[in-house]
Amino acid sequence: MRVSRLMLVTLRDVPADAEIASQQLLIRGGFIRRVGSGIYAYLPLMWRVLQRVMRIVREEMNQIGALETLLPQLQPAELWEKSGRWQGYTAGEGIMFHLEDRQERSLGLGPTHEEVITELASDLLRSYRQLPVTLYQIQSKFRDEIRPRFGLMRGREFIMKDAYSFHGDEGDLARMYEEMEKAYTRVFQRCGLTAVGVDADSGAIGGAASQEFMVTADAGEDLILISPDGDYAANQEKAVSIAPPALPLPSGESRVISTPGQVTIDELCSAQSLHPSQVVKVLLLLAKLESGDEQPVLVCLRGDQELNEVKLVNALTQQLDSPVLDLSPINADQVKTQGLQPLPLGSIGPDLSDHSLAGARSWKERFYKLADTTAAELERFVCGANTSNEHRWGASWSDLGTIPAMDLRNAKAGDHCVHRPEQSLEERRGIEVGHIFQLGRKYSLSMGAQITTKEGKQEHLWMGCYGIGISRLAQAAVEQHHDDAGIIWPLSIAPFQVIVVVANVQDEVQMALGEEIYNELLASGIDVLLDDRGERAGVKFKDADLIGIPWRVVVGRAAAEGNVELVKRSERDANVLSRAEAISSLLEAIPTELRIQL
């Protein structure tokens, strides 16, 4: 390929709306262009990168026996209603684009395909003899993101590989889950990425077990916690830890103290000479459920800990037998709208009476109370007295009443590891590029997907699902591999492996040597780009650095002696070599398996 025919348009200035380095470089390098909020066009260079990523993914999926298919992007609402997820994905999280056709039938643009694939399995899989089977596809997905950002990292349309496996028993599902974990590890290694597998929350997809694959990068949206020995890693949403011990409250009789203007933990601790671990703070939240109920929730936390909303939502969904569509703090205006007397916000204690909800217009008239274990373990503490500007000093659970306790706090860096308490968790940022789930029977039960067992019984299928964000992975590679001058593509996914830069195309000797090297590399199966533009040499060199081709051959003044410069993009040191030496070096550096099959 010649640059003069590539439609390459690069930018010198950083786009104003590009927030992170990888997004800036992909736009500046002519890889992508923004079409709308969260919507990007993949230009020729980017499409070549994506094709290379997809090829690696396909090879690894095929290697473990998965079968490629293509499922419809438009999905009937009744399938999602059957699984119980339509309301949550349209009215709850609201991430599914949905529409009505001219017959007023509701349809959704698929953010995921569990419903479609389970419906197909219910129709096509009848006997244990057909199992196990794994199907996968690579196609565009859609999410109505509230705030699209970071280019391809969080867009409203993106390319994804999703796979679904079906099994006759839980053990076989666990075997495939392990196989898929190994395949994902190989995918990321082959793509030149440093990725770590972490325990993760199953989210709206559900299931018994799940693992995320995170590319470590400072720009990552996810916080991951890792043990120094590498034996434990988890997304903060899922992470568990041992919190530092609380400082004991000084002895003394239980009493009510005046705390005017001391609404926050910091204000209270500063005024009363307390440590936050000596305080139990109370959060009032409103959970809106798929069932239509509006449930007030009272949560108790130790003052030095933060609420993990994912853990709380999971607990409420399980205990209230209805998915939580929304969880938000209760404020004074909401209390007034419900026709209730003002609550002493900032001075609320764990024993706040349900009488304060009596006569609520739409809320349940009883608090659902939960406590984090670190709060429940305190023997004596300070908490709100349920009267404005007053707190209890020396309160105890025996006086206030027992509240069900569970892990509801955010684990954080510095906490002790559960598996080895002598170690402390460390913090990293990560970009999620893959996620695997053991779904169990969640979808087969709701959608009636059964097979006949060897014993002649009808049993519901066991399922797994496995996703890789293809377009996100490509940008994550840039986030991990770049410098001040531009992108440094890993060789395996680079749009081209070599770029031949002719410094002066008007010089016949330079141009002739450039063409010879270009053609010889092509004949050897090297994917090579020839910069034959009539631009100044400096412009070409800057563009070559920006677009990040792994190897550069510079044909300049030394062409008269038959010499060229060979530059590795990741090192940028130039070596003067003869034409034959340069070609020999490139053939040695680029493995046969990465070359074009001629």
From Swiss-Prot:
Gene3D superfamilies: Anticodon-binding domain, Bira Bifunctional Protein, Domain 2
Primary subcellular site in the record, as a coarse category: cytoplasm
GO cellular component, one term: cytosol
GO molecular function: aminoacyl-tRNA deacylase activity; ATP binding; proline-tRNA ligase activity
CDD domains given in the database record: ProRS-INS (cd04334), ProRS_anticodon_short (cd00861), ProRS_core_prok (cd00779)
Subcellular location: Cytoplasm
Gene Ontology annotations of biological process type: prolyl-tRNA aminoacylation
This protein's UniProt keywords: Aminoacyl-tRNA synthetase, ATP-binding, Cytoplasm, Ligase, Nucleotide-binding, Protein biosynthesis
InterPro entries associated with the record: aa-tRNA-synt_IIb, aa-tRNA-synth_II, aa-tRNA-synth_II/BPL/LPL, Anticodon-bd, Anticodon-bd_dom_sf, Pro-tRNA-ligase_IIa, Pro-tRNA-synth_IIa_bac-type, Pro-tRNA-Synthase_IIa_type1
Signal peptide (residue range): none
Reactions mediated catalytically: tRNA(Pro) + L-proline + ATP = L-prolyl-tRNA(Pro) + AMP + diphosphate
Enzyme Commission code(s) on record: 6.1.1.15
Comment text on domains: Consists of three domains: the N-terminal catalytic domain, the editing domain and the C-terminal anticodon-binding domain.
Annotated function: Catalyzes the attachment of proline to tRNA(Pro) in a two-step reaction: proline is first activated by ATP to form Pro-AMP and then transferred to the acceptor end of tRNA(Pro). As ProRS can inadvertently accommodate and process non-cognate amino acids such as alanine and cysteine, to avoid such errors it has two additional distinct editing activities against alanine. One activity is designated as 'pretransfer' editing and involves the tRNA(Pro)-independent hydrolysis of activated Ala-AMP.
Assembly, per entry: Homodimer.
Family: Belongs to the class-II aminoacyl-tRNA synthetase family. ProS type 1 subfamily.
Cited HAMAP family: Pro_tRNA_synth_type1 (MF_01569)
Protein's recorded name: Proline--tRNA ligase
Organism: Synechococcus sp. (strain CC9311)
Gene that encodes it: proS
